[in-house]
Amino acid sequence: GFKDWIKGAAKKLIKTVAANIANQ
C-alpha cells in the first residue's frame, strides 16, 4: 500500500544520500 511505498522511497533516499556523502 501507500505506507509501503513511503517506506521504500525513504530507504532509497537514505541510500542515495549516504552514497553521495561517501563519494565526496
From Swiss-Prot:
Gene Ontology process terms (BP): defense response to Gram-negative bacterium
This protein's record includes keyword ATP-binding: no
Tissues of expression: Expressed by the skin glands.
Cellular component per GO, a single term: extracellular region
Location(s) in or outside the cell: Secreted
Primary localization: secreted
Keywords, ordered alphabetically: Amphibian defense peptide, Antibiotic, Antimicrobial, Secreted
Keyword Secreted: yes
Family classification: Belongs to the ascaphin family.
UniProt function note: Antimicrobial peptide that shows higher potency against Gram-negative bacteria than against Gram-positive bacteria. Has a very week hemolytic activity.
Entry protein name: Ascaphin-4
Organism whose genome encodes this protein: Ascaphus truei
